[in-house]
Amino acid sequence: ISIFLGEQLEDVVAQLVETGKADNLKEGGVLRTGVSTLPDFVKDATDRNRTSPFAFTGNKFEFRMVGSEDSIGSPNTTLNAIVAEAFCEAADRLEGAEDFDMAVHDLIKEYASKHQRIVFNGNGYSDEWVEEAERRGLPNIKSMVDAIPALNTEKAVALFEKFGVFTKAELDSRVEIEYETYAKEINIEAKA
């Protein structure tokens, strides 16, 4: 999975990683209509990348991975657990910091540097991204059924148990349910 930040936010992150601070804000520019009777418009610096599974669109992130017939509940539960872990880790470090502002600065720079490999503002459907993701060491899970085993890995179990979301037995059950649902849907489609 990659994340789309847009030119403006990507530039801020790049400044943080390279210099440790972000002093300049990239402007969106002007969208010229080419028609003398119409005004030119300010171009949004965040753009709209519709091929990204997780995109920043001005003032929010959009999560676009869930299929149209699927519930957002399970992915949201997972995202919330991941965010809770990140907040917990950040809070532990910041609460013990002697210089809070410097600790925030260092934490942002560290996170931006550590996770820079998931930022991709190009076409997420292209062969270029598949090659780039491989070069960056990112997994390329091509189907939902291939993603199911990630639900009950040691890392996933530890995350969900840490926050009291799911036990290992509950995650094992969810894996079984996902496989069963997939098999039923494939059988129905095969008979149609």
Per-region residue spans from a language model:
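Acidic, glycine-enriched catalytic cores built around paired aspartates
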Residues: I1-A192
